[in-house]
Amino acid sequence: MNETDQIKPCPCGSGLGFTFCCGVKGRTALNAEVKIRLSDDGSIAAGTPTPQLQKALDTLESNPDLFPARIRFIDNKAWYVKMSPDWYRESVFLDPERIKGTYVVETSLSWLQVVCDRIPWQPTAFIFHTAFCGSTLMAQALEALFHCLPLREPEALGNIQYYLSNPAVLPEIKQAWFGRVMRLLSRRYHPQQGVVIKANDFSNPLMCDLLRWDPSVPMLFMYTPLNQFVAGCVKAEIRREWIQGRYKTVKAKAPALLKMADMPEPEATSYGEMAAIYWSYNIALLQQAMGFESAQLRSLDFNHMLDHPLAVVQACGELLGLQPLSGVDAQAEIDKLFGTYSKNSNFKYSPEQRAKDIERALTEHKAHIDRAEVIAHQLLGDAYPEQGLPGSLI
């Protein structure tokens, strides 16, 4: 770290120096100490806020500078981190382990309930996906061409999803909190700016919950065809561990959704079967959501975006109700993003690299892919998307 880094203000906007805030080596929102703790009435119970933090607290109802990193209903607590437009842009994902902001504020849910009940719902769009399908790239492209605040995989969605599944909580209480969390996430920096929430793939069940809550919510579901999804799951050890974990999360839920009494039980290394079950489960979730007959719910094969990136990104912006930025060379921005895919400034990945990786994986793991095709056809039956998913964006 150079001398400039040592003395510069932290990009989170906390008012502290970078090396004393988000620049502390090894610090994340998970392991950072709580800087400010509020009482149930909103008064400061612990810590001394900087003027910048006090302003963020005072404007929390309208300004997203304090972002809900985690909401723990069982503990009656919520934790927020100080953010800024730059820090949102640099945060590949917004879960506590990877979000850039590490200045932590803690409150009770009693206080949050009062605050959220005063926050108006502002139209917000969602991107759901299967994983390995360019959803992060789409969020970046929307930010480059439109007035857009992309929220990439906020854990708060998973927190409310888990809460909704709690049978001990009354439905009306769960729905009230669902609305509060959605309104909290819908805050933006200026009225023209549209919020686009790119959900974690865990959160695909929320598609139906959202449509019940507000049938007009715009949604895009991104996916890759099964063979490419399987190739993405098996091409490296970290990916194989990933699909094992994902399979374990849905294996108890998938039979009812897929109407399969006898669900295949993959062996420990049957990654193709695990991928087929997880992919089929998510495709079935989309098809269930399509039953709401919302014109605002569309699907997109990642390959179509790679073939026609500018047209697809513009069509997505229109679907999601975003306003184009003025004075932007859209083609140049798209060429920059798609010429070298970059999740952030430390990650570079070209389309040629992706194509070679997929081609190699399709060849090397043909047995996994062939088995996956058999399993997915069994699980989805006539609903297997031979010609792509319904409601295509283009």
Language model regions located:
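Acidic/negatively charged segments and metal-coordination signatures
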Residues: 1-43
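Short, charged/polar micro-motifs that form catalytic or ligand-binding hotspots
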Residues: 11, 125-132, 196-200, 272-276, ...
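Short linear Ser/Thr-Pro motifs
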Residues: 14, 135, 342-345
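A generic secondary-structure signal for well-formed alpha-helical elements
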Residues: 25, 29, 146-149, 320-324
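PAPS-dependent sulfotransferase catalytic domain
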Residues: 32-292, 296, 303-326
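PAPS-dependent sulfotransferases, especially Golgi type II membrane carbohydrate sulfotransferases
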Residues: 33-116, 258-275, 283, 287-293, ...
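A polyampholytic, Gly/Pro-enriched intrinsically disordered region
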Residues: 169-180, 239-254, 346-356
